[in-house]
Swiss-Prot record:
Residues 1-21 form the signal peptide. Induction: Expression is induced during host plant infection. Coiled coil: none annotated. GO terms for cellular component: extracellular region; host cell cytoplasm; host cell nucleolus. The RxLR-dEER motif acts to carry the protein into the host cell cytoplasm through binding to cell surface phosphatidylinositol-3-phosphate. Effector that enhances P.infestans colonization of Nicotiana benthamiana leaves. A motif (RxLR-dEER) lies at residues 39-57. It is found in: Secreted; Host nucleus, Host nucleolus; Host nucleus; Host cytoplasm. It comes from Phytophthora infestans (strain T30-4). Keywords: Host cytoplasm, Host nucleus, Secreted, Signal, Virulence. This is RxLR effector protein PITG_18670. Belongs to the RxLR effector family.
């Protein structure tokens, strides 16, 4: 009984490998159909578009998180830079005052 199973398994493996080599078009030997790749891209927030020469181009669709949170490029960077400079100056002043207290002792 077990030998019949092994024979069927070997036959199926040989048949699949020979059948995939017989296709002249390499696109026909793919394991997953085109619809599966398009569905998985839709889940990831992307879509497939056709190029000029027939190739597939993957484009990213705007994700829903972009509607909720602002992107860093949309924020006013001058305010952030000014706040960072003030924080650096305060840090330097605190460091100098600590060194001055240490030298006075």
């Amino acid at each position: 009984m077990r030998s019949i199973f092994y024979f069927a398994l070997a036959f199926a493996a040989l048949t699949c490998s020979n059948a995939s080599a017989a296709f002249p078009n390499p696109d026909e030997t793919r394991l997953l159909p085109d619809t599966f790749t398009k569905r998985s891209l839709r889940v990831a927030g992307q879509e497939v578009a056709r190029g000029d020469r027939g190739e597939e181009i993957v484009r990213v669709i705007v994700q829903s998180t972009n509607k909720i949170f602002k992107r860093p490029a949309e924020k006013d960077m001058s305010k952030l830079i000014a706040a960072a400079k003030i924080a650096m100056l305060e840090k330097k002043m605190a460091k100098l005052s600590f060194v001055g207290k240490k030298a006075a002792k």
